[in-house]
Every structure is written in C-alpha cells, then in structure tokens.
Amino acid sequence: MKKITIIAVSKNRNINNIEEAIRSGINNFGENYLQESLIKIENLKKYKNITWHFIGKIQSNKTKKIAQNFSWCQTVDREKIAVLLNKFRPKNLPPINVLIQINNLKELQNNRYIDQYQELAQLILSMPNLNLRGIMAVPSIKTNVIENNLQYEKIKTIFNRFKRQYSSVDTLSLGTSVDIKESLLATSNMVRIGRNIFNI
C-alpha cells in the first residue's frame, strides 16, 4: 500500500490552529503567503519534526526567504525561480526539495510544452542546492466527466515519464479537499488539505 503524505494547508490559520494540528499528528504544512508564513515558522521552531512546504505563487524577490526557510518548494514553474532558489539556499542546509508546477494542462498533449518541463527538470538536476522530487498540479474541476478525467490522465502520464527518466522523482502533489478520489486514482502520493483538517 503506497504512502500518502498529507499537507495541511495552513494559510490564514493562526499559531494555535497549527499547534492543534501538530498535536493531532500532522507534521507537513503548506503555506501560500511568504510574510505570513515566516511569522509562523519563527514561532513554531520548537517543533523539530514539522516540515514546511511553500505552495504559493513565487515572485523573484521572495526566492531568498523561501530558500532560507522552507524544506520544500512545490511551485517552481520557470528557470529563473530555480536559479534563484539554488543561489540563495544556505550551504548549511540540505538541498531544498523541488516540485515542478504544471500550469498549462490543456497543452500537455503538445510535445513542445512537455519538452519545456523536461528542460526545467534538467536544469534543476544540474543544481547542487536543489533536489528534484516530482511535479505538482492544480487541475480545474470540470463538470464534464470526460474532460475532468482527461486532465488527471495527462498529469499521471507526465509524472510517470519523469519517474522513468529521473531517479530522484518520487512525488506527485495532486489533490485537495474537493478532488481527493480523482487524484489518488491518478497515482498522487501527496495531497493538500485545508478546511477538512482545520475545520474552520
């Protein structure tokens, strides 16, 4: 039975909310907003077994703080961000775990778009302070079942291709509170859950 990692999406949650989740056994937290997350990371340093994932949109001017404070960055979608994360990752920390965010699901059947992601993967693999772990995607929820299933099949296909090509790839971050079933069928092994964990 495969292991599923649950990321508690803790944006807009306070320190007490997160501590309650920690006491319930959650130890992976996903943050979208950098300034908010830095306050939480600082105040929760006493918990040595928790892991912080950055899951928000990345701007270039935020890469330094992300590289310094997070164990995972799930939203790397272009070369510039990878280069800056590698540059700013402190030498006394292990390489930051990186997921490539797949943005344009409509175009995944076009080899040109797949090639772009593979070029980004090759760049990340060449950088000593980055550890390529897989891909992350956020499908749009379609009312048309066929269209909906096709998105997940596309993501599964590119993930399997990455796994065959790159030995470090082992993570597909796919799935939220609204599409867990579809995501697990697409072989996701990391899901991002917010309301269903914090219940507020």
Curated annotation (Swiss-Prot):
The record's section on InterPro entries has: Ala_racemase_N (IPR001608), PLP-binding_barrel (IPR029066), PyrdxlP_homeostasis (IPR011078)
Which Pfam families does the UniProt entry name for this protein?
Answer: Ala_racemase_N
Tell me the superkingdom of the source. Bacteria
Keywords (A to Z) from UniProt: Pyridoxal phosphate
**N6-(pyridoxal phosphate)lysine found at:** K11
**What transmembrane ranges does the database entry give?**
none
A molecular function annotated in GO for this UniProt entry is: pyridoxal phosphate binding
Q: How does it assemble?
A: Monomer.
The UniProt family comment states: Belongs to the pyridoxal phosphate-binding protein YggS/PROSC family.
PANTHER family for the chain = PROLINE SYNTHETASE CO-TRANSCRIBED BACTERIAL HOMOLOG PROTEIN (PTHR10146), PYRIDOXAL PHOSPHATE HOMEOSTASIS PROTEIN (PTHR10146:SF14)
Q: What does this protein do?
A: Pyridoxal 5'-phosphate (PLP)-binding protein, which is involved in PLP homeostasis.
| This protein's name | Pyridoxal phosphate homeostasis protein
